[in-house]
C-alpha cells in the first residue's frame, strides 16, 4: 500500500542535492513514445533513474535511462546526450572491435512535462556493475583471469573512443563498467517477479519512488563501458580540475593540460583495485569528507617516485609544494610505499615482474610516455595465454 510520507529517504531521495521536481515521475506500466513499456526499476543515480522496459516495435527488452530535468550550462545530462549522438555517428561510419564493449544508445528522445523536458536514453540491458561484482567476492578481490579479461577489453573500448571518436571518457571506474548479459533469462525473471509481486511505490508529495530490482551478476568477462556524462573531446585543450578523486591522473592533479592518457591511468588504477580489493590512492580527509591535494601528491610520489622536474616546473603548484630542485617541501611526509609491496595477490616471481612492468607503463607522471591503448593491448602480462605459465 502506498504511503503518503516516507519515514526514511528511499533510493534517489537519499542522494545529496535531491530535488523531487528534477526527477521524472515514472510508474511501472507507463508507455513512453508509444513504444516502450516500463516494467521495473533497475537503479538510480544523481542524474537519472534506470528502468527495464519492453520495446513493442523490436519485441526486445530495453534499458530506459530517464534523466533528470537539467538544462544548465555544463549539464552532465546534456553532455551525455551530445556525446552519445556523436558516438552513434562514428559507430555507423566504420566497424571496430571496441564497439562490442561500449554501451551505445539505441534511441534518444525527450518526455515533455509542464516543467520542462526529460531525456530518455534507450540502450541494450546489461548486468550489474563491476563495483557490484566486487561486493560478492571475499575482500573485493576478483580472480586474476577475470581481471585480465575485463581490462583487456576495456582497453579495446577506449582505443575506439580515442583513435576513432577523439573523445576522452574521463570517468572510468568499476561503477561505470557493466557486465554483459549472455541472454535474457534474468530480464524475464525480473518481469515475472514484477508480475507476481508488483512494486508498490512510496508516494512523497505525489511523486512515486520505487525500489530497484536486482540485476543478474554475470561472470562472462565481457565488460561494457558506460556513463558518458563526464566525457570530453580532446580538442580544444583540457586543463581544468576533472575526474573522480580516486582515479585522477597526475597531470590533472598538477593542473596541466590533459587528454587521452587520463583514461589509461584510470584503467591502471582500476586494475590494481580489482586485483587487491582496495584503492592504490586514498587522499581523502574522512573526518570532513574532503579531497586533500597535498596528501594526494605525497601518495603519488610514494608509489611513483618524485615527478620529473621538467614536468612539475610547468605546474602552477610547483613552488607551493616543491623547491626549485623538485624536492617535496610540504606536509604530509612522503609515505614509505611501493608497488611491489602493494601487489600481494600475484606471488613474487616472473609473473609479478611482468605485471609490474605492465602497470609501470601506465602509472607514469608524464602522460607523453604513458602507454597508449594500442601499445598496452599486446602487453605480455595482459596477453599471456591463461593456460601458460610465466
Summary of predicted features, one role per range:
Residues 1-390:
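Intrinsically disordered, low-complexity regulatory segments of kinases
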Amino acid at each position: 500500500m502506498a504511503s503518503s510520507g516516507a519515514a526514511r529517504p528511499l533510493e534517489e531521495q537519499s542522494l545529496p542535492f535531491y530535488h523531487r521536481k528534477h526527477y521524472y515521475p515514472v510508474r511501472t506500466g507507463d508507455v513512453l513514445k508509444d513504444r516502450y513499456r516500463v516494467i521495473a526499476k533497475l537503479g538510480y543515480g544523481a542524474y537519472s533513474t534506470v528502468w527495464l522496459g519492453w520495446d513493442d516495435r523490436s519485441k526486445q527488452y530495453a534499458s530506459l535511462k530517464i534523466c533528470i530535468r537539467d538544462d544548465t550550462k555544463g549539464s552532465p545530462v546534456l553532455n551525455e546526450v551530445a556525446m552519445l549522438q556523436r558516438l552513434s555517428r562514428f559507430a555507423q561510419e566504420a566497424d571496430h572491435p571496441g564497439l562490442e564493449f561500449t554501451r551505445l544508445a539505441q534511441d534518444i528522445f525527450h518526455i515533455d512535462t509542464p516543467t520542462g523536458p526529460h531525456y530518455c536514453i534507450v540502450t541494450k540491458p546489461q548486468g550489474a556493475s563491476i563495483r557490484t561484482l566486487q561486493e560478492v567476492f571475499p575482500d573485493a578481490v576478483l580472480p586474476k583471469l577475470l581481471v585480465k579479461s575485463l581490462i583487456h577489453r576495456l582497453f579495446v573500448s577506449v582505443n575506439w573512443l580515442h583513435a576513432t571518436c577523439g573523445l576522452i571518457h574521463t570517468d572510468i571506474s568499476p561503477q561505470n563498467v557493466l557486465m554483459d548479459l549472455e541472454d535474457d533469462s534474468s530480464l524475464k525473471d525480473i518481469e515475472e517477479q514484477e508480475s507476481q509481486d508488483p512494486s508498490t511505490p512510496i508516494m512523497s508529495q505525489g511523486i512515486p519512488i520505487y525500489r530497484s530490482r536486482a540485476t543478474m551478476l554475470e561472470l562472462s568477462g565481457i565488460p561494457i563501458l558506460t556513463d558518458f556524462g563526464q566525457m570530453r573531446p580532446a580538442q580544444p585543450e583540457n586543463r581544468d580540475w576533472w575526474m573522480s578523486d580516486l582515479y585522477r591522473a597526475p597531470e590533472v592533479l598538477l593542473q596541466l593540460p590533459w587528454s587521452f592518457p587520463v583514461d589509461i591511468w584510470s584503467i591502471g588504477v582500476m586494475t590494481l583495485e580489482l586485483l587487491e580489493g582496495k584503492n592504490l590512492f586514498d587522499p581523502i580527509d574522512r573526518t570532513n569528507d574532503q579531497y586533500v591535494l597535498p596528501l594526494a601528491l605525497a601518495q603519488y610520489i610514494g608509489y611513483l617516485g618524485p615527478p620529473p622536474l621538467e614536468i612539475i616546473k610547468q605546474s602552477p603548484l610547483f613552488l607551493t609544494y616543491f623547491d626549485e630542485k623538485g624536492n617535496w617541501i610540504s606536509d604530509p611526509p612522503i609515505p614509505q610505499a611501493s608497488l611491489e609491496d602493494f601487489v600481494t595477490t600475484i606471488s613474487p616471481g616472473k609473473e609479478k615482474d611482468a605485471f609490474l612492468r605492465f602497470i609501470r607503463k601506465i602509472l607514469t607522471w608524464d602522460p607523453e610516455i604513458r602507454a597508449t591503448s594500442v601499445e598496452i593491448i599486446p602487453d605480455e602480462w595482459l596477453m599471456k595465454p591463461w593456460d601458460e605459465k610465466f
